[in-house]
Amino acid sequence: LQGIEQFVYNLPSMITHPSYKELLSKRKGISDTAIIVSTGPSLTKQLPLLKKYASKATIFCADSSYPILAKHGIKPDYVCMLERTEITAEFFNNDFWEFDKDIVFIVKSVTHPHTIKYLQKNNRAFILVSTYASFIQYLKLDYFGYFNMGFSVAHMACYLSLHLNHKNIIFIGQDLAYAENGNSHPDDYQNSANYESQMYEHILTEAYGGKGEVKTHHVWLMFKQNLEQDIEKIQKYLDTKVYNCTEGGARIKGAIEKPFLWACENLLDKDLN
């Protein structure tokens, strides 16, 4: 019911802003490589390289990564938000002035109304997108387009990058596990680095690079398994390579594990600006 209520509340903003179909028609195929920035504890060490190569890739960042990138002066092309909770909306409760220019915020249409309030308050460019939910399709808003967004904002960014015809998808900060010191997020994370450290029971899973095991929890494990299923389908049906350049956290089976430096030097050879 929360999703239905918030969708109805957000509907005027959806129909008065550009559609998802319009985004695809204007942006499809303009870049070969997408970097998906998640908010795992390994993100911090990748920020200097990301800043150096930012102009050579299309950057999709999670809502929670957005304030971190802003702090370090790294401008993403897209900021994605999937969840419908009020605490998630708070990632947009800030004002970064000129930094936001040319960033497109892609937000699921059932998002909390505070999300829209913060976006409008700072004149940010945004698009509300919908999944294939029955109650949404009943309204016949086909013109605005639909897409399956998965269970996490990283899935959403991955699908979006596929729809925009990227040939290489690079994940960073996609730990899906706790750091060695027990932190669940980077030091700059808005809700504290240990926000999820004691929230769930810890489970062991194979580590990045097959080097032993790391601690995770059941929600991250579900995200990991769904991502692995997606990568298997991508490998089977598309000419797209998926790289896990997190250099930490859990192993995501099927993703090509490479240092982020290797990916930057070998895949990012031209300036998109």
Give the predicted meaning of each segment.
Residues 113-172, 176:
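Active-site/ligand-binding-proximal alpha/beta "capping" segment
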Residues 80-101, 129, 186-204, 262-271:
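Acidic, Ser/Thr-rich peripheral helices and adjacent loops at domain boundaries
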Residues 61, 127, 168-173, 180, ...:
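A structural signal for short, well-ordered beta-strand segments and their strand-loop junctions
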Residues 157, 170, 174-184, 188-195, ...:
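Non-catalytic helical/linker scaffolds that mediate oligomerization, partner binding
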Residues 1-36, 41-58, 67, 71, ...:
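N-terminal donor/sugar-recognition subdomains of glycan-related enzymes
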